């Protein structure tokens, strides 16, 4: 419980910061499809296609592959993530490198390199904490920029009769090189819904507070991601 007491105040502070008064408000719907293929106990590849407004970006479409590298699974993590189809949740550390091609209406295309490290921690009472540190390296019109983002997620599996679903909350601040400050805070609340052995839906609400440009902008979005999971490993 000590870890939980340390985590919840942080989420509360980030929520208060994100809800400060702003002048402009928008709402969006963000569809996404991710297809994962586990190659062996160490490597997994996936292809992502999504609409997003991450870090205060305009509405845009991103597509591209990633490679993930796992460390060995932990028994405690496997217990709390038993009903989650994402096998990376059972690993203490997951490293990722990826590429995204990004397009937006009336804007030049953009390329992005992604480097990320995610640590997963089992908590008491069946809770699960995930800490993702990610760097985006962007090139647009031959101009380079970068941003750092740190996403903390807290989830727990619940059961209704024989069906298991996984509600979660998350917070992610962004540091943008073009503004030289922490310019965006994103808050998430949603749930994972496993369907069979290969499909898992992620339905969520996202609230963004963007302070990089003037006036500040507040964006609320509803998102729905379909995650597909396949494996070459024999179980």
Predicted regions span which residues?
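Transmembrane beta-strands of outer-membrane beta-barrel pores
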Residues: 41, 49-55, 99-105, 121, ...
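Detector for outer-membrane/organellar transmembrane beta-barrel domains
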Residues: 120, 128-173
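Start-of-domain marker
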Residues: 25-90
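Sec/Tat signal peptide C-region and signal peptidase I cleavage site
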Residues: 20-24
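Outer-membrane beta-barrel "beta-signal"
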Residues: 69-70, 74, 117, 218-235
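Residues that define the transmembrane beta-barrel architecture of outer-membrane proteins
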Residues: 27-29, 59-63, 109-113, 144-150, ...
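Repeated loop/turn-to-beta-strand initiation elements of outer-membrane beta-barrel proteins
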Residues: 41-47, 74-78, 92-95, 124-129, ...
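Membrane-embedded beta-strands of outer-membrane beta-barrel proteins
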Residues: 33, 63-65, 115-117, 150-154, ...
């Amino acid at each position: 419980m000590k870890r939980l007491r340390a985590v919840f105040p942080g989420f509360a502070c980030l929520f208060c910061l994100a809800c400060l008064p702003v002048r402009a408000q928008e709402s969006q719907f963000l569809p996404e499809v991710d297809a994962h293929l586990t190659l062996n106990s160490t490597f997994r590849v996936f292809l992502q296609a999504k609409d997003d407004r991450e870090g205060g970006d305009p509405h845009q479409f991103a597509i591209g592959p990633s490679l993930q590298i796992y460390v060995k699974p932990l028994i405690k993590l496997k217990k709390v993530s038993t009903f989650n189809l994402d096998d990376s949740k059972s690993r203490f550390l997951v490293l990722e490198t990826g590429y995204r091609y990004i397009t937006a209406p009336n804007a030049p295309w953009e390329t992005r390199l992604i480097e990320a490290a995610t640590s997963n921690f089992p908590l008491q009472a069946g809770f699960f904490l995930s800490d993702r540190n990610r760097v985006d390296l962007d090139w647009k019109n031959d101009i380079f920029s970068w941003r750092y983002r740190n996403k903390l997620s807290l989830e727990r599996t619940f059961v209704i009769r024989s069906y298991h679903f996984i509600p979660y909350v998350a917070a992610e601040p962004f540091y943008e090189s073009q503004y030289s400050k922490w310019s965006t805070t994103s808050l998430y609340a949603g749930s994972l819904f496993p369907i069979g052995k290969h499909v898992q839906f992620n339905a969520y609400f996202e609230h963004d507070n963007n302070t990089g440009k003037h006036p500040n902008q507040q964006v609320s979005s509803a998102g729905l991601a379909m995650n597909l999971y396949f494996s070459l490993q024999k179980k």
